[in-house]
Amino acid sequence: MPVLATSDHAIKRDPNMVAAGVRAVVKTQQALKRDPSLATRVGKALFPPAEAALIADVIARDLPYYDPTISEAAVDGLSRFAQASGLARRSVSYNQVVALEFRHLWTA
């Protein structure tokens, strides 16, 4: 799942900026699903040539997992993992992890 991490403060201060970020993640995933070779163009600007040549194949391999939604089950599983591995002392709720006011953008 993609993650766009921000703070409650940023959401309150500029919800439009946060919404734009969510829309950008969703649109990028949609574009890569249509044409994984787009990743090569971006990769050439960011990575050494050998790695840039591989990125489209990596993206194509991972396309089944390109889903912008974050389920309650996923949050619950991550929370349990964080507790079991000592990264967290207590569980967190879905509402604490996901900014509910932006969920509608996942499928827009």
Per-region residue spans from a language model:
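Secondary-structure end/capping motifs
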Residues: 13-89
